[in-house]
Amino acid sequence: MTHTSRPVTPEELARAVHKRIACICYFGGDPTPFLPHAIMASKLALKNKPNRILRICWETNGSAHPKLLRQMVKLSLESGGCIKFDLKAWDEKLHIALCGVSNKRTLENFAMVATEFLPMRPQPPLLVASTLLVPGYVDEDEVSAIANFIAQFDPNIPYSLLAFAPQFYMSDLPTTSRTHALRCLEAAKTAGLSRVHIGNVQLLSSAYH
């Protein structure tokens, strides 16, 4: 849909890619619900621009059907783009509480991408991950478990720890504290990951320890 709520075909979207654009990134609203459209538009955009850089990138909760996910990853692999998994939580019950669904498929899909595709192009990174540090829910134990899971495939997979900002149903929570973020950073490094960083550092607070 456009800003006027008019449906746009994959062909129209592909034609709208400006000649100066070097990356198409699907995020901020998971692309899973409209993957067939996004995949087709991406294929057409690459076909229309064969002699210049045009990377296809994705940020996803990892819940897509494996058949569609493989198509997503292939587009990123071939174009020089990447796919980022938002690994919300390790504990399944916590994941259901926060997201309303199990994380089983997300973890299975991450493992599939890491084993089937990552060896084809370790650099620049094809597969990256992130976790939102929700105060009172996602602590260093959760991050440690997630980081150990990632590290078993490749300790060089980039991992971002993101500061939480109170919004919507969680408007009563504080922003992530600096001490919370640093504990999680240390936990991820201890798990063996070598490329960990804290994102959204401007949001970090001293609201709790």
What are these regions (language model features)?
Residues 3-173:
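Conserved AdoMet/S-adenosylmethionine-binding subsite of the radical SAM
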Residues 178-209:
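A cross-taxonomic marker for long C-terminal extensions/tails that follow the last structured domain
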